[in-house]
């Protein structure tokens, strides 16, 4: 079992911890708790870079080793880092579990050292018709992020 963690930081009062685990070459399970967000859906993605020197803006685009368009987690045509939305309750918190086979913790396309980003708006899953739908899901600003680091 390989495990990883990302501790979210934010200039907007958002905080949280995201845990990743993978057994063998099976799918990766992502569990998280995030607080300080407005209620509703928020885009949730793995971005290509683990660089937070300029806050969440320096994490680069969505992790996309196959060079595909943005999409929903269940789509064949999607960025590997497209994890859809997290649902935030009226109290500003979200607790979630996501299982995904395109974000391994080992191998050539490992997400270790990359960043996880929570966005300010819902991800339209590439289907919104907006000019940004096929690249970012039109998910708005980057309100929190953390670098995915290996856990012992």
Swiss-Prot record:
Enzyme class: oxidoreductase
EC nos: 1.15.1.1
Binding residues annotated for Cu cation, in chain numbering: 45, 47, 62, 119
Cysteine pairs bridged by disulfides in the record: 56-145
The keyword Cytoplasm is assigned to this record: yes
Keyword entries, A-Z: Antioxidant, Copper, Cytoplasm, Disulfide bond, Metal-binding, Oxidoreductase, Zinc
Source organism superkingdom: Eukaryota
Matching CDD domains: Cu-Zn_Superoxide_Dismutase
Record function comment: Destroys radicals which are normally produced within the cells and which are toxic to biological systems.
Assembly information from the UniProt record: Homodimer.
Family: Belongs to the Cu-Zn superoxide dismutase family.
Protein name (database record): Superoxide dismutase [Cu-Zn]
Source organism per UniProt: Ipomoea batatas
Taxonomic path: Eukaryota, Viridiplantae, Streptophyta, Embryophyta, Tracheophyta
């Amino acid at each position: 079992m390989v495990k990883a963690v990302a501790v979210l930081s934010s200039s907007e009062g958002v905080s949280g911890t995201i845990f990743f685990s993978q057994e063998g070459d099976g799918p990766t399970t992502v569990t998280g708790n995030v607080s300080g967000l407005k209620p509703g859906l928020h885009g949730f993605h793995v971005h290509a870079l683990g660089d937070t020197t300029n806050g969440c803006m320096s994490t680069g685009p969505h992790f996309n080793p196959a060079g595909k368009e943005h999409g929903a987690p269940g789509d064949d045509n999607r960025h590997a880092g497209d994890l859809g939305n997290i649902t935030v309750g009226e109290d500003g918190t979200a607790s979630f579990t996501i299982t995904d086979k395109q974000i391994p913790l080992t191998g050539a396309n490992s997400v270790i050292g990359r960043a996880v980003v929570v966005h300010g708006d819902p991800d339209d899953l590439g289907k919104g018709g907006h000019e940004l739908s096929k690249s970012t899901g039109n998910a708005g600003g980057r309100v929190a992020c953390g670098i995915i680091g290996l856990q012992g």
